[in-house]
Design a protein with these regions (language model features):
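Membrane-embedded helix boundary and interhelical linker motif in transport proteins
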Residues: 11, 33-80, 84, 260-264
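Alpha-helical transmembrane segments within multi-pass membrane transporters and channels
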Residues: 27, 60-104, 111, 246-251, ...
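Short loop segments and helix-boundary regions at transmembrane helix junctions
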Residues: 33-37, 76-119, 161-168, 173, ...
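Transmembrane helix-bundle core of multi-pass membrane transporters
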Residues: 88-164, 191-194, 215, 257-265, ...
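Membrane-interfacial amphipathic/re-entrant helices at transmembrane-helix boundaries
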Residues: 1-23, 51, 63-66, 92-97, ...
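Inter-helical junctions in multi-pass inner-membrane proteins, predominant
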Residues: 2-19, 161-166, 192-233, 256-270
Length: 299
């Protein structure tokens, strides 16, 4: 593999990794405050893709407006999921919440299967995203550089929120000790709902970017992507926002470059990502940026 092809694959890997990272942030933040793996999170990504397509293609809104409306709607939808499915089980066992999360996931997948059918739909987006730019012998699409850039900018914005605002301080406090937070008069449920809203909006954005890059959507599109995003969160150190982004980029890079090096194994590209995750966890079970000294996540 020559240098130009390798650089091309690096860009493609970073783009795919950025999509995983956006979804992984939601996994890691919800886990941080609830110690819950929200299996419905990846289906919110699917909802975001369908919502954007509907608002853009059927309603006729400008694409940017459709995306922003989708982010807001999915944020509210995430809060609704928390309010209806998870809040009544705050004091229940973790296995009860886990089963509920799986139930919400199955419900959303089957609901959209009934509403839109089980067949794949073409995701139409403005031509701008698929226009190419040449940098020497490296040719990349606009979406390939936009995704990593926006992912990094959003990471910086989230870190600012977590460490420079009182809402961020409250989020970190809930993640550390929710019972003490309640004794201090802070509405923990409100903070948890805020986390669900933020994570759901990011998942929706990840779904939009993924659908632009791989322009077919269906009600089950979130299953495999969600597993990879969860793997990215675990790889980076679940509970660490920076780790989730780092894990997403590493996973995307590994998946794309491995297939480029071994094209005959292209049918097993999904296995490369999980194999790499297993190898890392064998040597560092807490993930790359996880801290085994901390029982509670502090982001």
């Amino acid at each position: 593999m020559d240098g130009a092809i390798f650089l091309q694959q690096v860009v493609n890997g970073m783009s795919l990794g950025g999509m995983y990272a956006l979804i992984a942030i939601g996994y890691t933040m919800v886990y941080g405050v609830l110690r819950l793996i929200n299996f419905a999170h990846a289906d919110v990504m699917m909802v975001g893709a369908f919502s954007t397509l509907f608002l853009f293609s059927s309603v006729g809104l400008p694409f940017g407006v459709a995306v922003f409306l989708t982010l807001g709607l999915c944020g509210l939808f995430g809060m609704l999921i928390d309010r209806v499915a998870y809040r009544p089980l705050r004091q229940a066992s973790k296995i009860s919440m886990l089963i509920t999360a799986m139930g919400v996931s199955f419900f959303l997948e089957n609901l959209f299967n009934v509403l839109f059918g089980g067949s794949s739909r073409f995701f139409s987006a403005p031509d701008f995203f698929n226009q190419t730019r040449a940098f020497g012998s490296v040719i990349i699409t606009n979406v390939a550089w936009i995704v990593p850039l926006i992912t990094v900018l959003l990471l910086l914005a989230i870190l600012w929120l977590l460490y420079r605002t009182r809402y961020g301080m409250a989020i970190r406090a809930v993640a550390f000790d929710v019972n003490t937070v309640r004794l201090m008069g802070i509405d923990a449920n409100r903070i948890i709902s805020l986390v669900f809203a933020l994570g759901s909006s990011l998942a929706a954005l990840g779904g939009v970017f993924y659908s632009i890059s791989y322009p077919t959507i269906d009600p089950l599109m979130g299953v495999l992507i969600g597993l990879k995003a969860f793997a990215a969160a675990v790889l980076g150190g679940i509970g660490s926002v920076t780790g989730a982004v780092l894990g997403g980029f590493i996973l995307g890079f590994t998946e794309v470059v491995a297939v480029a090096i071994f094209p005959e194994l292209g049918g097993y590209k999904d296995a490369f990502a999980f194999l790499f995750l297993i190898l890392v966890l064998l040597f560092r079970p807490v993930g790359i940026m996880g801290d085994e000294r901390l029982e509670r996540s502090r982001f």
